[in-house]
Curated annotation (Swiss-Prot):
Cell compartments where the protein resides: Nucleus
Keywords: DNA-binding, Homeobox, LIM domain, Metal-binding, Nucleus, Repeat, Transcription, Transcription regulation, Zinc
GO CC terms, sorted: nucleoplasm
Gene: Lhx4
Protein name listed in UniProt: LIM/homeobox protein Lhx4
Region (Interaction with DNA): 161-181
DNA-binding region: 157-216
Chain's role: May play a critical role in the development of respiratory control mechanisms and in the normal growth and maturation of the lung. Binds preferentially to methylated DNA.
Organism of origin: Mus musculus
GO biological process per UniProt: animal organ morphogenesis; apoptotic process; medial motor column neuron differentiation; motor neuron axon guidance; negative regulation of apoptotic process; placenta development
Length: 390
């Protein structure tokens, strides 16, 4: 900004004849009309000479006689200079003269008549509540709350969505492979390349990271689920094997004890220690030992360490005559030929031998109602029984 005043030229301008004796190179030229100045007074602004009639404002063309302002080689009056280069109103984008009263909102400056609501055009006075938008526009409180309620209702009914093309998606995916969380300048570059808003790019990366995290969590949960299912399946299989094994081996201990008493009662035995097993006779003594031969058929298999033998069928019991009871307090050992050797306490040695390969017992055929279903060999259901000695 420069300020200049009209100054008189050195010496009074003489008439033309006198001027003819002066070289023309010494006569100044006007910066406005490029003519030699032959006036009495010469105006000098920006080190240039002007006719008094040529020094005018570049905007309003008003002659400048008292004061002027210059910028970039042009001369302006005070009003036009501040309009062009002074502080501008945020609303109308016009310059504000320094003598005019203004209103300010944060860093924005307004004319008095421009400081108004953009919706209802009501001029805001001192003390009125208003909302300042990012671009400097003003909205009064009543209109802002009304517009916000309308926006909320419309947002609930219709939600705007951003459509991303295949090319844009490919660019974003490649950038995600390089860096799942890119810096701001990378997002700005992607925004310029794809044409998407920077906020859209940022939200896409946030959603992508959340999706990857959710997929990893679901994959881990699926692996643990498969592990637990396999463990449960293996435990269930072993449990079924145990149950099937228990079914193959017979019944439980309580059922076995009950059925044992039932069978023995039907067979005519009086107690569980088989004290009357000696009633089964019909054997032939041979060299201090005897063999049990009731029906001409040998018995099945006797358990190792068992002090008694169970006949193959109840019919074989009725055909055997009675003889004297066996001696108590016998000591038993197992013979290699599937037999049992009984040693008497007084040195009397008797061998109770039962050969394997006899007929199949009818206890497991279900032919009689009084006999439950058992496996073919008594060894399978007498395995877990405890037999007290005589």
């Amino acid at each position: 900004m420069m300020q200049s005043a009209a100054v008189p030229a050195e010496g009074a301008v003489k008439g033309l004849p006198e001027m003819l004796g002066v070289p023309m190179q010494q006569i100044p030229q006007c910066a406005g009309c490029n003519q030699h100045i032959l006036d009495k007074f010469i105006l000098k602004v920006l080190d240039r000479h002007w006719h008094s009639s040529c020094l005018k404002c570049a905007d309003c063309q008003m002659q400048l006689a008292d004061r002027c302002f210059s910028r970039a080689g042009s001369v302006y009056c005070k009003e036009d200079f501040f309009k062009r280069f002074g502080t501008k109103c945020t609303a109308c984008q016009q310059g504000i003269p320094p003598t005019q009263v203004v209103r300010k909102a944060q860093d924005f400056v307004y004319h008095l008549h421009c400081f108004a609501c953009i919706i209802c055009n009501r001029q805001l006075a001192t003390g009125d509540e208003f909302y300042l938008m990012e671009d400097g526009r003003l909205v009064c409180k009543e209109d802002y709350e009304t517009a916000k309620q309308n926006d909320d209702s419309e947002a609930g009914a219709k939600r705007p969505r951003t459509t991303i093309t295949a090319k844009q998606l490919e660019t974003l995916k490649n950038a995600y492979k390089n860096s799942p969380k890119p810096a701001r300048h990378v997002r700005e570059q992607l925004s310029s390349e794809t044409g998407l808003d920077m906020r859209v790019v940022q939200v896409w990366f946030q959603n992508r990271r959340a999706k990857e995290k959710r997929l990893k969590k679901d994959a881990g949960r699926h692996r643990w689920g498969q592990f637990y299912k396999s463990v449960k399946r293996s435990r269930g299989g072993s449990k079924q094997e145990k149950e099937s094994s228990a079914e193959d081996c017979g019944v439980s201990d309580s059922e076995l004890s009950f059925r044992e008493d039932q069978i023995l009662s039907e067979l005519g035995h009086t107690n569980r220690i088989y004290g009357n097993v000696g009633d089964v006779t019909g054997g032939q003594l041979m060299n201090g030992s005897f063999s049990m031969d009731g029906t001409g058929q040998s018995y099945q298999d006797l358990r190792d360490g068992s002090p008694y033998g169970i006949p193959q069928s109840p019919s074989s019991i009725s055909s055997l005559p009675s003889h004297a009871p066996l001696l108590n307090g016998l000591d038993y050992t197992v013979d290699s030929n599937l037999g049992i050797i009984a040693h008497a306490g007084q040195g009397v040695s008797q061998t109770l031998r039962a050969m394997a390969g006899g007929p199949t017992s009818d206890l497991s055929t279900g032919s009689s109602v009084g006999y439950p279903d058992f496996p073919t060999s008594p060894a399978s259901w007498l395995d877990e029984m405890d037999h007290p000695p005589f």
